[in-house]
Amino acid sequence: MVVIGAGQAGLSAAYYLRKFGIEPESGFVVLDHASGPGGAWQFRWPSLTLSTVNGVHDLPGMSFAETTGTDAEQVPASVAVPHYFELYEKQFELPVHRPVHTRVVCPREERLRIETDQGVFAARGLINATGTWERPFIPHYRGAESFRGRQLHTKDYRTAAEFEGKHVVVVGGGISAVQLLDEISRVTTTTWVTRREPEFRDEPFTPDIGRDAVAMVEDRVRRGLPPGSVVSVTGLPVTPAIRAARERGVMNRLPMFSEILPNGVKWADGTVDADVILWCTGFRSSLDHLAPLHLRGPGGGIPMTGRLATQVEADPRVHLVGYGPSSSTIGANRAGQAAARELTAYLGIGE
């Protein structure tokens, strides 16, 4: 078997494969495109610290808190989480082949042919945990190519200081958009633009809210629809930082502009000059390498089945963890366990 991806979902799946009696290297291999441990966390912007991150859940069998120390709140997540993942790989003897770029996965009778830049693997089963970081999404708007300023995606963001003295248009209604809007607005002027009116959640996040959100996303993927985001169901939490930003007048949202001009953006009733457009418009699942398997259904998504909707309906040898309802870190752990259990049972191997 092959596990592609060594982020939260991939490491969880590898842990449970080993727990179910499958030995690494002889029974399964883990391939990861990054040069070091940490999944997408290693690429996050430095100001995203453990005090501002939306939550890092424990991998099975090892506490994250035990690896961070007592004064970890201001440690960048891009440092703390990769350190945790590195210790985890060593603790549970989960060798990860890296960097390995998976080019394509093709059906070959009873096996899957997995072609990479480091060679070819033949696998009876596949757990795909490639996440979304490699597929940033930027919607197309008329005039985008004429803009004389800078356009960048959340993935490219490093620090607010580089925008000092420039007017920044922040596009997007998710958690990252709100966090970066707040951060940038402390050093320069901003305009916030979203496609829909953001929904804020004043009440505390409860397990029931989380379960309801996951259930709605799970229903979509079981019906073969594109997953949608969990935050679109849960709403945005009103943190002290957001309250302070409201008081500073930063959270006054405008609807989406209709056109991008060389020096700004345009609505039907006016324009705003801009030096920078920051697209906090999310990511799409990194699944292009699976295209030869023809997994997508007529609904535009991949119809999923299994206990936690990790098994691909069109090919039970393939599980997607970190897709749809398992895209959160806590969901990824449960999905990794379910995928490992169901795949080994389907193949008739392991304990």
Task: Kindly give the residue locations of the regions a language model identified.
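Flavin (primarily FAD) cofactor-binding/catalytic cores of flavoenzymes
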Residues: M1-S35, G39-Q42, S47, E73-E351
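Redox-cofactor-proximal catalytic regions of oxidoreductases
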Residues: G36-F64
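A short acidic, helix-capping loop that chelates divalent metal ions and anchors anionic groups
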Residues: E66-D71
